[in-house]
């Protein structure tokens, strides 16, 4: 698949593991005009569940930002942490659960392979299917705006 950038990397134990999006940078949609949708959601989440917000920020966003990539296992299994969204071409959803709030969270992002960026588009609490479809459409719309700005 073209949208998944797999890279071989040695871990500290010397074994090889597949990493997703190694060497990519992070772009938080519209943070350059002070509309950081994902960062704002995580800031609000920190007030009620700092552990989950910190986990998303440090274990996902910061690892990509530092160029380390994410483990390919996050896309595998019955309940993958990262799932490709069917409606979007290169759209993924990061799935987390806040045990403190007893709510599922979704962080939507796309992969810009040309510019080697992971573009974080939207973050929200999961609700009914209708609301989730709207959240996905919003993420797709934001990614199209991002691509238009890149031209």
Model-identified regions with their sequence ranges:
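Short glycine-rich, acidic/polar surface loops and turns
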Residues: 104-110
């Amino acid at each position: 698949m073209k949208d998944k950038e797999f890279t071989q990397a040695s871990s500290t134990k010397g074994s090889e593991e597949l990493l997703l999006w190694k060497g990519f940078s992070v772009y938080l949609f519209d943070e350059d005009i002070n509309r950081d949708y994902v960062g704002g959601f995580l800031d609000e989440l920190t007030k009620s569940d700092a552990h989950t917000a910190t986990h998303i920020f440090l274990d996902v966003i910061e690892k990509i930002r530092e160029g380390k990539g994410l483990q390919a296992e996050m896309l595998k299994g019955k309940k993958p942490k990262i799932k490709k969204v069917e409606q979007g071409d290169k759209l993924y959803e990061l799935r987390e659960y806040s045990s403190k709030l007893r709510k599922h969270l979704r962080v939507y992002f796309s992969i810009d392979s040309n510019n080697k960026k992971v573009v974080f588009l939207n973050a929200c609490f999961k609700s009914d299917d209708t609301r989730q479809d709207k959240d996905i459409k919003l993420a797709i719309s934001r990614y199209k705006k991002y691509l238009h700005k890149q031209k």
